[in-house]
């Protein structure tokens, strides 16, 4: 909640539609500049991730690590805004990890290459 408040304070507004794939498509279209979320599952985001990346958007975990559909946190942006967003999301995510919040990858099928 603290992260939500901080990002609301430095942005022109925060909007959540309830569907991560739709949020990713809105970033890809330029309707919004970014979206972020914790505790997603692969089926929540896969289609939207493809659309965002094909449109030239940037996608990482909220602590700046490479993203895969098995990641439990996601930060997506128009690209140029990404480093500024990470200044907010990275320390908050690291604090959650120190508190024992589970952001390990969801089940990755045996033999599946994340790279």
Language-model segments: residues:
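IMPase-like, lithium-sensitive Mg2+-dependent phosphomonoesterase catalytic core
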Residues: 1-115
């Amino acid at each position: 909640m603290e992260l939500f408040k901080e990002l609301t304070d430095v942005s022109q507004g925060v909007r959540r539609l309830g569907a991560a794939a739709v949020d990713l498509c809105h970033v890809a279209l330029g309707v919004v500049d970014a979206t972020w979320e914790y505790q997603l599952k692969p089926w929540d985001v896969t289609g939207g991730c493809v659309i965002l990346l094909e449109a030239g958007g940037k996608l990482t975990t909220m602590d700046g690590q490479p993203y895969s559909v098995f990641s439990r946190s996601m930060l997506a942006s128009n690209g140029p805004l990404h480093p500024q967003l990470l200044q907010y999301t990275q320390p908050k995510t690291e604090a959650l990890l120190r508190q024992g919040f589970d952001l390990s990858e969801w089940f990755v099928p045996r033999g599946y290459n994340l790279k």
